[in-house]
Structures are given as structure tokens and as C-alpha cells.
Amino acid sequence: MRYNGLNNMFFPLCLINDNHSVTSPSHTKKTKSDNYSKHHKNTLIDNKALSLFKMDDHEKVIGLIQKMKRIYDSLPSGKITKETDRKIHKYFIDIASHANNKCDDRITRRVYLNKDKEVSIKVVYFINNVTVHNNTIEIPQTVNGGYDFSHLSLKGIVIKDEDLSNSNFAGCRLQNAIFQDCNMYKTNFNFAIMEKILFDNCILDDSNFAQIKMTDGTLNSCSAMHVQFYNATMNRANIKNTFLDYSNFYMAYMAEVNLYKVIAPYINLFRADLSFSKLDLINFEHADLSRVNLNKATLQNINLIDSKLFFTRLTNTFLEMVICTDSNMANVNFNNANLSNCHFNCSVLTKAWMFNIRLYRVNFDEASVQGMGITILRGEENISINSDILVTLQKFFEEDCATHTGMSQTEDNLHAVAMKITADIMQDAD
């Protein structure tokens, strides 16, 4: 075996006979898997190699190597299936468990990068530290069986149809990278830089994207449930045809984001910034959008049933077919908004602000509107709002005006009083 201290130990797969003796590579019979295992040639298991393992475990180690040898011998035309790969990997994990304390017992695989930066992860098991040599990166295994890419520069890398579950990309530079058809369950991207990255048809459930920089990135047809995106920078990101159930976007910066056909019940967007964003065909049922900045956003075909929107800002926002039934929208700000075919029935709109709004077929049936302030722009046509409710809203508003000034208000100074109420509510929100 080629051996240099503890830095490079390759396990041979075809060079041990059934009597545990060591044979020379020149006398080793070629197998159908030679093409696949050609990077193992000129390696031997000898006493020096076995000395890396506990003396009492030598027989076990040799037995495991023989089992792997038989698997390789049975491979047709040098090909290896994912199922066979997993079996072999299990043997090597078992081998590593017998390494003595002098060894660095991290099991790694070799990641080959071709000239187009496409990745092929081969089954090369050895005990080694992370190294970068020529165009090959030695990637150590994580404790959970994934790969440790942490803090590497992988700009423009293309990874397709790989199992990267439990891998670690923390602090990685992944600008313009592409992950397609990959299993990335429980993968860690904490603090990764990934502008213009593409995740296409990937499994990202239970992963960690906290504090990433993902400007202009794309999630397309992904499953990203129970994912942590808190404090993430995702402005101008595109998220479409994706599941985000129970994911956490606490204080995420998502200005100008484009969300299309997203299923995200129970999502947490508390204090997130989605200003100037476009949201269409979104299921935010039972979501938390409290204190979210949606100023100058466009919201169409949104399900916000039974959601929380405390102190949410929707000024100068266009809303069409937004369903907020049974939602709690206390202190929400709709100033200068345009609402069309929206439903607020049975919702809590206590102290909501609706100054200078445009309404078209908006439903406030059975809504709680105590303390609401509302002024509708004159000259608007097709205002289909229940007249009794509108009178009630205006009555509540005028009563609130009186409590702020100590006297009833005329129409001339109504707007000035409304602005004072707004300032008071803003102070309460802070």
C-alpha cells in the first residue's frame, strides 16, 4: 500500500485472497470491475496498513475487505449501482470504527470535477484530511454520513442526481451553482454565499439556510419543508412550484422576491421584508406574517385563512383575491392600497388603517373592526361593500377621532386626525 504517515491510506478491494495473504498487483486476476476501481491499483494491505487498526480487530477488518472484494468482483462491466454503492459504503464505515486512535477516521469520497464543472462522486474510501489537488477535491464524510464541503469555493459547480443528505456547505461560496434532482435532506448551508444559485427539483426538507446570501437565487419544484431561512438575504429570489410548509423566514430580507405557486401553510415570516415583491397563487394558511413589510407589493390569489398579520405593512399594495377569513389583522396598515375581490369576513381588524384605499367587491362580513380608520377615495366605481358595515366602520372611526381630540370632527379636518391616529398606532407598534 502506498502509505505516508497517516495522511493517505487506500483500502484495496481486489488484492487480498481468501487465505488472508497479500498478493502482488501483477498476479492479481482482473475483474469486471477493474475500470471502476482502477484508482486502487498499486495498493496493498500489508502489516503496516493493518497496524493502523487495533490488533484484535485485524480479522474483522480483513473479513470486511473480502466482502467488498466479492461485491466488486460481481459487478458487470465495471458499473456500480447506487444500491451496491450503499452496501460497500456500510462496510467501510464498519472498517473505520475499528481504526485506532492514531488515525483520522473520517471516511471520505472523491468528488471529480470535469472541465464543465459537473460533479461525479465516486466510491473512493480512505482516511484522510480535506485536500485539493489538481481538479480533484477530497470531501470528508460528516458524522451523519453526508459530505463536508464547508468553506470551499464551489462557484459554478453543477451537481445532478446525487444524494447529499446530511451534508455540510456552511460558509461555502456557491455563486451560480446548480443542484438538480438532488436529495439534500438535512443539509447545512449556514452563512453560505449563493447568489444566482439554482435548486431544481431538490429535496431540502429540514435543512439550514440561516444567514445565507441568496440574491437572485432560484428554488424551482423543490420540497423545502421545515427549513430555517432566518436572517437570510434573498432579495430578487425566484421561488416557484415549491413546498415551504412550516419553514422559518424570521427577519429574512426578500425585497422584490417572486413567489409563484407556493404551498406554505404554517410558514413563519415574522419581521421579513417582502417589499416590492410579487406573490401569486400562494397558500399561506395558518401563516405568521406579523410585522412583515409588504409595502408596494403585488398579492394575487393568496390564501391567508386563519393567519396572523399583526402590524403588517401593506401600504401602496395591490391585493386581488386575497382571502383573509378568520385572520387576526390587528393594527395592519392598508394605507393607499388597492383591494379587489378580497375577503376579510370573520377577521379581526382592530385599529387597522385603511386611509385613502380603493375597494372593489371587498367582503367585511362579521369582521371585528373596533378602532378601524377608513377613508375611501372619492370617484371610485364598483365599490361592492356591505353598506351597513361601511357605516359602522365610519362610525367607529369618527368615535376614535373624538377620543383623540376631545371633540367631534368635521369632514374638513378628518384626514388630519386620521394621520394623528396613524402616528399613535405606529408608536405603539414600535
Curated annotation (Swiss-Prot):
Pfam families: Pentapeptide. It comes from the Bacteria. This is Uncharacterized protein YjcF. The gene is yjcF. Signal peptide: none annotated. InterPro entries: 5peptide_repeat, Pentapeptide-BTB/POZ_domain. SUPFAM superfamilies: Pentapeptide repeat-like. It comes from Escherichia coli (strain K12).
